[in-house]
Amino acid sequence: MHDIEFIKNNPELFDKAMLSRGLESQAAKIIELDLQKRKLLTELYALREQRNAITKEVTVLKQSGADCSSHVETSKKLAHEISELEERIKRDTGLSYLLCSLPNIPDDAVPFGKSADDNVEVRSYGQKRSFSFEIKPHYVLGEMLNLMDFRRAAFLSGSRFSILSGQLAALERGLASFMLEMHTKEFGYTEVFHPSLVNDLAMFNVGQLPKFTHDSFQTTDAMRLVPTSEVVLTNLVANTNLHRNSLPLRFTAYSQCFRSEAGSAGQDTRGMIRQHQFSKVELVSITDASQSNVELERMLSVAEEVLKRLELPYRVVLLCTGDMGFSASISYDIEVWMPAQNKYREISSCSNCKDFQARRMGAKCFYLEKQNKRSSFVHTLNGSALALGRTIAAIMENYQNSDGTITIPDALRKFMSADYIRPGTALP
């Protein structure tokens, strides 16, 4: 959600920001709609004053026994006009919808660009392994090991689903435990277990609605399956006014995520890279405005630490204006090396949304200044640490052996009680 006063005071700056996001100039239209709304509000206040004055006159006339029928009729007429005007204002002349449909303003540090091709590499980590045998993609390895079944998943649920069994199922569980233990015990995040169904308001608050209505799965009673734990963890502070000294707040959750993947037909149709259902460990931070840039770098380092301990090569890229998410003001992607594809693939995205989400959900913080309470919107940040399906795929491809087994990274062995992933028994 955008600050209308900022737009009115900085129309050229706002238009430049929207143009960098690939949109047309919007400031003039927003200012005109705001002016229309203010005119309607002025009319409404005037009608209410008239009605209040007549109501007082009616009271006096009744007390004196005088005829007040004409005043009563006028009052009824005004009440009807007020009701109609309130309804017009509620419809808002399209102002609120427009403000809610426009993406966040990019931070000054964000490079201009139209697509992922314009993202800027910040750093890379780790040595890419050299293989003395033909590299197999993770989905081939999984089926060879009898531990990954796409055929049965398709029979049950359709395309873009998978079934893991045996040691791969244990790897999923072990990865979640490894990540959560690290985030909570070493980096101070509070673990949260939450519902997988949320209402439209929760989705709106984080910017998933109204723009991305078709990207989520909706139930028959108008609930939605969570596309990411960000929805729930960020909404934990909706409609609050927190003391600034209580910040930052840091939450983490392991959950199933559900996405329709609208617009991705033909992309990554095999394997675990792009699925309708996947699991993820999410990080969310709530800060004040002065802390959010530092918190973003901290969050990014936490996500990187997962990959460092798994000894997976990766790189960090700063997203350009044309590739950032709707609610983000600045985003870093972490891309893990996938040997079978011979390229890096996104495994995490860490974003600072600044006050964009907080304005939508009414999340503020306050401090006392000479006994006066000063409030401002909080800043919200979110990041994946990490997407488990892609982490499993990366481990399988980077740690594969010539005999088809997978070496388990040292950091995971205490969670797996094994050194290798070996062939299992096929499902019936």
Curated annotation (Swiss-Prot):
- Name the principal localization, coarsely classed: cytoplasm
Which principal EC class is assigned to this enzyme?
ligase
* Short name of any one Pfam family annotated for the protein: Seryl_tRNA_N
- Listed GO cellular component terms? cytoplasm
Pathway where this protein functions: Aminoacyl-tRNA biosynthesis; selenocysteinyl-tRNA(Sec) biosynthesis; L-seryl-tRNA(Sec) from L-serine and tRNA(Sec): step 1/1
Q: Which GO terms describe its biological process?
A: selenocysteine biosynthetic process; seryl-tRNA aminoacylation
EC numbers listed for it are 6.1.1.11
User: Which cysteines does the record link by disulfide bonds?
Assistant: none
Enumerate the transmembrane spans.
Answer: none
Q: Which compartment or compartments is the protein found in?
A: Cytoplasm
Keywords (A to Z) from UniProt: Aminoacyl-tRNA synthetase, ATP-binding, Cytoplasm, Ligase, Nucleotide-binding, Protein biosynthesis
Q: Name one GO molecular function term.
A: serine-tRNA ligase activity
Gene3D superfamilies per the UniProt record, alphabetical:
Bira Bifunctional Protein, Domain 2 (3.30.930.10), Serine-tRNA synthetase, tRNA binding domain (1.10.287.40)
Q: Where does ATP bind?
A: 259-261, 346-349
Q: Catalysed reaction(s)?
A: tRNA(Ser) + L-serine + ATP = L-seryl-tRNA(Ser) + AMP + diphosphate + H(+); tRNA(Sec) + L-serine + ATP = L-seryl-tRNA(Sec) + AMP + diphosphate + H(+)
- Output the superkingdom of the source species: Bacteria
User: Which amino acids does the record list as binding L-serine?
Assistant: 228-230, 282, 384
Q: Could you describe the subunit structure of this protein?
A: Homodimer. The tRNA molecule binds across the dimer.
Family stated for the protein in its record: Belongs to the class-II aminoacyl-tRNA synthetase family. Type-1 seryl-tRNA synthetase subfamily.
**What's this protein's function?**
Catalyzes the attachment of serine to tRNA(Ser). Is also able to aminoacylate tRNA(Sec) with serine, to form the misacylated tRNA L-seryl-tRNA(Sec), which will be further converted into selenocysteinyl-tRNA(Sec).
Q: What is known of its domains?
A: Consists of two distinct domains, a catalytic core and a N-terminal extension that is involved in tRNA binding.
Q: What is this protein called?
A: Serine--tRNA ligase
Q: What is the lineage of its organism?
A: Bacteria, Pseudomonadati, Pseudomonadota, Alphaproteobacteria, Rickettsiales
The gene behind this protein is serS
